[in-house]
């Protein structure tokens, strides 16, 4: 039986991270691959490249917009597109065109969600045990920092999740063995639904003001931009920990920085405004801040898992 054709659009130097030898073999096991993934520029005739293709594998959003609605309509055979690693902006625009051409689009980017959730759990554990702070103290010459009674553990903490979508729910799942209380806010999630993953739904004001650890998991939309206000930030408990692997646009970033400078709470952050932050940004000097350079969802293993997850979704849709 003739195997279905799968078109892999260009993503340039990212290609081997998602489509390594193992994943390429996995895809070739059930399909004929039309592979433009390593290209840095759009192919000269995208419609020609799509001839006879039944499905698109979109490794990330770098070249997604090369595939236009007109090209898809001209070809007429593409019926499925699976996203390996969703890039907001480029994918949002591209998939609107794909859907308009009658293509069914599936987001299979769970690998990225898993990576961010694991980073978040690691940040929480780092924060309660003050790993980074103690490391800095010992490197600075403190022979044996006495922090026995300032370090803590997750057990007994109230953890507030702001955003209960994919990542928020994964974080809630990872926290289950730790004997924590989990509260959460999401405008589009009901209290009944939240309870199914052991989260007690609370208003945003309550989550921000009463949690020992706050973790942000909202996407950036017109509704969520600066949703977390100065009042919310100033209500955070003294000494609490805020973890941000989402985006800075969802909070009042100026108020966030001011409160950190005053030492009102602690933060572990993977996102900044702008990115990267200037080398002389005072945030880099705050002792109550731990920073990573936007890597929560960008690891070598994450790329492999994203590729694998999308390929297996394609297999399911194309051959059952």
Residue ranges and their predicted role:
Residues 106, 230, 239-320:
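Rossmann-like dinucleotide-binding domain for NAD(H)/NADP(H)
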Residues 84, 104-111, 204-205, 294:
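Short beta->alpha connector loops at strand-helix junctions that form conserved
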Residues 65-76, 223-242, 253:
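Rossmann-fold NAD(P) dinucleotide-binding segment
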Residues 101-158, 173:
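Phosphate-binding beta-alpha-beta segment of Rossmann-like dinucleotide-binding domains, i.e.
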Residues 47-51, 72-75, 154, 207-211, ...:
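A short, aliphatic-rich alpha-helical micro-motif
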Residues 60-61, 86, 212, 218-220, ...:
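Short glycine-/small-residue-rich Rossmann-like dinucleotide-binding loops
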Residues 26, 147-238:
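Rossmann-like dinucleotide/phosphate-binding beta-alpha-beta segment
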Residues 1-106, 229:
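An N-terminal-biased, well-structured beta-alpha scaffold segment characteristic
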């Amino acid at each position: 039986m003739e195997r279905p054709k799968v078109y892999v659009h260009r993503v340039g130097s990212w290609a081997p991270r998602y489509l390594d030898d193992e994943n390429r073999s996995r895809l070739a096991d059930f399909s004929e691959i039309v592979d433009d993934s390593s290209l840095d520029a759009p192919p000269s005739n995208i419609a020609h490249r799509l001839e006879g293709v039944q499905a698109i594998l979109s490794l990330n959003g770098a070249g997604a917009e090369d595939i236009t609605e007109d090209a898809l309509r001209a070809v007429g055979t593409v019926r499925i597109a699976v996203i390996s690693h969703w890039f907001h902006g480029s994918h949002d625009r591209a998939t609107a065109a794909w859907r308009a051409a009658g293509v069914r689009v599936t987001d299979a980017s769970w690998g990225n969600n898993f990576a961010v959730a694991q980073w978040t759990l690691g940040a929480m554990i780092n924060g309660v045990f003050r790993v980074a702070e103690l490391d800095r103290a010992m490197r600075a010459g403190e022979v044996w920092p006495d922090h026995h009674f300032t370090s803590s553990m997750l057990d007994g903490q109230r953890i507030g999740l702001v955003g209960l979508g994919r990542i928020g729910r994964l974080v809630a799942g990872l926290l289950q063995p730790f004997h924590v209380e989990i509260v959460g806010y999401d405008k589009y999630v009901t209290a009944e639904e939240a309870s199914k993953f052991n989260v007690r739904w609370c208003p945003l004001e309550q989550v921000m003001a009463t949690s020992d650890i706050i973790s942000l998991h909202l996407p950036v939309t017109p509704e969520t931009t600066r949703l977390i206000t100065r009042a919310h930030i100033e209500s955070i408990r003294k000494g609490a920990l805020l973890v941000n692997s989402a985006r800075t646009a969802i909070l009042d970033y100026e108020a966030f920085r001011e409160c950190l400078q005053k030492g009102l709470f602690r933060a572990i952050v993977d996102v900044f405004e702008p990115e990267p932050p200037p080398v002389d940004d005072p945030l880099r000097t705050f002792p109550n801040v731990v920073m990573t350079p936007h890597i929560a969802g960008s690891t070598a293993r994450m790329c492999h898992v994203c590729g694998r997850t999308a390929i297996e979704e394609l297999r399911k849709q194309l051959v059952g």
